[in-house]
Amino acid sequence: MRMDERKQKVLAAVIQDYILTGEPVGSRTIARRYNLGVSPATIRNEMADLEEMGLLEQPHTSAGRIPSDQGYRYYVDCLMPPAHLTPEEEEYVRRRYNQKMLEIEQVLAETTRLISEMTSYAAIALGPDQGRASLEEVQVLPIQVANKALLVAVTSTGVVEHRVLTIPEGVTPEDLNRISRVLNARLQGRALEDLRQMVLSDIYQELAQHRNLVNLVRDLLQQLLSLESGERVYRNGTLNILNQPEFKDLDRVREILSFLDQDEALRRIFMTTPSTGLTIRIGQENKIEGIDKCSVVTISYAVEGKIMGKVGLLGPTRMQYSRAISVLRCVADALSQTLEQLYR
């Protein structure tokens, strides 16, 4: 059966109405609201054809139609009108990123808050791969607690790690400063993934005259080697799914919330999408268990042309796709610009 212009108009009207109301759509509703220039009977016949083509579904015998995953896909690829944020919204995004944020964790956490706020969907983000990062700086600092010190490690991707550790009796601030110098001299510029295999003998030898520091060095190195080597996952607005009528079923809600709570599950979303550009996965196009009734939209962000990670959102298949896409594009651009400033 051929998809002609009238069928396209009917399909677009059904999808737009269903996205707006969440209720199955009948032919009379389309005739009344969308001024297609044909009778309800003609629209009804077109809707029956669209159902036969797999683009619409009829959830109940006497109800109207709703879009299928295939129908949404056709709409997104062929029929969806372009959408843009208003100048006021674009300025709002810029202002949010103009806040003083010194660490990449702050920037990505703010990014997920912003996406969730502007779309009312669950927002997710994948940070830079720390396995490919290197150690930029390490400091061991005294703190106002007996026998404690603060280890601060900064990576080349802007991630800052903090660790509090116990130090031996008699270790002075001058000793901690010496340890910092030795660690920086030996470890600065090393890839994090290489730290586990590095030879420690040089460091132990250099600090050998300070016997009470040897054990501290060992503990410090253990802390450094425990730095996360994978991409960190950020999320916000996961409870937004409770506001969607599709997710009123408690078992389905539990399944989705459980999925959103698992870092590794969210990483799989990003790892199964192309590394660059915008990707839209609708319903069963998501081959990951737990989200086959959802749509996922992701987009990459970059620093000086190098892809660093991805941001995205998860919501019902009855998603305002054009709005979601325009928000993600604007946010990804602002995020990339912010990170370029941060890395300088």
Curated annotation (Swiss-Prot):
Keyword Protein transport among record annotations: no
A Pfam family matched in the record: HrcA
GO-annotated biological processes: negative regulation of DNA-templated transcription
Domain of life: Bacteria
InterPro entries: GAF-like_dom_sf (IPR029016), HrcA (IPR002571), HrcA_C (IPR021153), WH-like_DNA-bd_sf (IPR036388), WH_DNA-bd_sf (IPR036390), WHTH_transcript_rep_HrcA_IDD (IPR023120)
GO molecular function: DNA binding
Keywords from the UniProt entry: Repressor, Stress response, Transcription, Transcription regulation
HAMAP family listed in its UniProt record: HrcA
NCBIfam families xrefs: hrcA
Family as reported in the entry's similarity comment: Belongs to the HrcA family.
Cited function: Negative regulator of class I heat shock genes (grpE-dnaK-dnaJ and groELS operons). Prevents heat-shock induction of these operons.
Protein name: Heat-inducible transcription repressor HrcA
Source organism of the structure: Moorella thermoacetica (strain ATCC 39073 / JCM 9320)
